[in-house]
């Protein structure tokens, strides 16, 4: 176990110099008091959520749960939004962007006063992206899988997350239904 003075975040907040004075004043500017986080591990929550990614629609609530857990464990949580890779709507393919997410994850963890990370993900490319970035940074991290994508409903029937599109596309092509 490391001491409070050994925390990586103390490089930003600990020294009695101009730069750290500036860091502390900016955090106060955000409405935080130094006692809320000084001496506690600052835990970055890498959250690849956006409103276009159906894999992660439940992440806003999950982030709140993670924050509560970090606080209860004695840490200080900060959410760090990251590139969201939703296979369903991104063109031409999310594979092109997976390495961007890895680089962004690494740089978010490197450039901010972060002592450890909670990595969130769920889609095919999000999971390896956040893991590769955190591994490159070599900080204590834990991965929280998003779980299954929320399913939809249509005409009273529960739809699968991706398989029903093929069934209903065949029905549409056969002239048995329209898009309404």
Residue spans of the language-model regions?
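Glycine-rich oxoanion-binding loops at beta->alpha junctions
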Residues: 22-33, 71, 75-119, 175-178
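Glycine-rich phosphate/diphosphate-binding loop of Rossmann-like nucleotide-binding domains
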Residues: 35, 44, 50-84
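Electropositive phosphate-/nucleotide-binding environments in soluble metabolic enzymes
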Residues: 16-20, 24, 39, 56-64, ...
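Residue-level "edge-of-site" marker
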Residues: 40, 83, 147
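Gly-rich Lys/Arg/Thr-decorated short loops/hinges at beta-loop-alpha junctions or inter-strand turns
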Residues: 2-14, 43-50, 80-92, 163-167
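Gly/Ser/Thr-rich loops at beta-strand to alpha-helix junctions
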Residues: 49-56, 121-127
